[in-house]
């Protein structure tokens, strides 16, 4: 019995020491602030998973800030944000990057094959943006958008001019746009919205992009991780992980759907990281 007590005491002491070292390690590391685009499902999922890895695997304290796209870029440039994983280039955020490229670093690619444009349900009998005026009445002359000032909204304004559309672009938010889309889908009514991939709505409904013969919205894009130049010095280990972090349609889709189904972003991210240790290990090597 005495031997058992001694062994138990040693085990408890070792566990306490390990916990103390872990706490000390976290205390010695700087707090990191990541920004993400408020209302963008992919941005929410990607940033929360990255934050979970930084916290649970690398021992950093992480603060998350939901912001608009323009503020995200400005925040990284000023150092208010250490990094953001939602830099869509070359089209969507091209204007922001052109203005701030001397003050930020693109440190990694976290998603390839991204795309923006105008989206309709598959039951809608319109194929091209150029054909929208012919169906103005069906759409009530309206394009349902997201946040005013977002890159996709700027491109949509350009598309309205380029195609001489007699349509109004209605600003709302990412969640409000999907609510309007859900309502239209339920009633099988025509609707055209600003949209992008990756997004959980493509897993939920049969949707397609309208053809864009003038290429106003550009070709497929890449989502980059953008960081303040000081991150490498401030937190080299974190910078290394963020450079390596990249995931697939299936991976990001699983987290986005979990959130859409009612899970909190933090819990969805935590569960995904716990269920995919080998993938996480790849990012940390």
PLM feature spans:
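Immediate post-signal peptide segment of exported/extracytoplasmic ligand-binding proteins
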Residues: 24-34, 133-140, 278-285
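A bilobed periplasmic-binding-protein/Venus flytrap-type ligand-binding module shared by bacterial periplasmic
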Residues: 115-125, 221-234
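A ligand-binding cleft/hinge motif common to bilobed small-molecule-binding domains
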Residues: 85-100, 183-208
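Short helix-initiation/N-cap motifs at beta->coil->alpha
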Residues: 40-41, 63-75, 169-180
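A conserved helix-loop-strand patch within extracytoplasmic ligand-binding domains
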Residues: 102-149
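Extracytoplasmic "Venus flytrap"
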Residues: 29-48, 69
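Ligand-binding cleft/hinge of the Venus flytrap
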Residues: 50-59, 134-169, 274
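Bacterial N-terminal signal peptides that target proteins for export
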Residues: 2-13
């Amino acid at each position: 019995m005495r031997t058992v007590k001694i062994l138990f005491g040693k085990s408890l002491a070792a566990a306490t020491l390990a916990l103390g070292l872990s706490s000390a390690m976290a205390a010695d590391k700087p707090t990191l602030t990541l920004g993400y685009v408020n209302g963008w499902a992919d941005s929410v999922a990607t940033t929360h998973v990255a934050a979970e890895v930084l916290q649970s695997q690398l021992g950093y304290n992480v603060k998350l800030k939901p912001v608009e796209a323009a503020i995200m870029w400005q925040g990284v440039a000023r150092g208010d944000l250490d990094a953001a994983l939602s830099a869509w280039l070359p089209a969507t955020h091209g204007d922001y990057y052109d203005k701030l490229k001397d003050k930020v670093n693109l440190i990694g690619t976290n998603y390839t094959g991204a795309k923006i444009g105008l989206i309709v349900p598959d039951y809608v009998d319109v194929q091209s943006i150029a054909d929208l005026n012919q169906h103005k009445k069906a759409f009530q002359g309206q394009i349902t958008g997201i946040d005013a000032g977002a890159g996709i909204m700027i491109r949509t304004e350009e598309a309205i001019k380029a195609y001489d559309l007699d349509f109004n672009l209605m600003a709302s938010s990412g969640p409000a746009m999907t609510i309007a889309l859900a309502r239209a889908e339920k009633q099988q009514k025509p609707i055209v919205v600003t949209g992008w991939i990756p997004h959980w709505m493509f897993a939920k409904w049969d949707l397609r992009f309208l053809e864009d013969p003038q290429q106003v919205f550009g070709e497929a894009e890449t989502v980059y991780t953008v960081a303040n130049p000081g991150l490498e010095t401030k937190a080299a280990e974190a910078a290394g992980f963020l450079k390596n972090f990249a995931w697939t349609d299936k991976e990001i889709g699983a987290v986005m759907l979990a959130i859409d189904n009612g899970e909190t972003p933090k819990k969805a991210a935590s569960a995904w990281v716990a269920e995919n240790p080998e993938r996480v290990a790849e990012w940390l090597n």
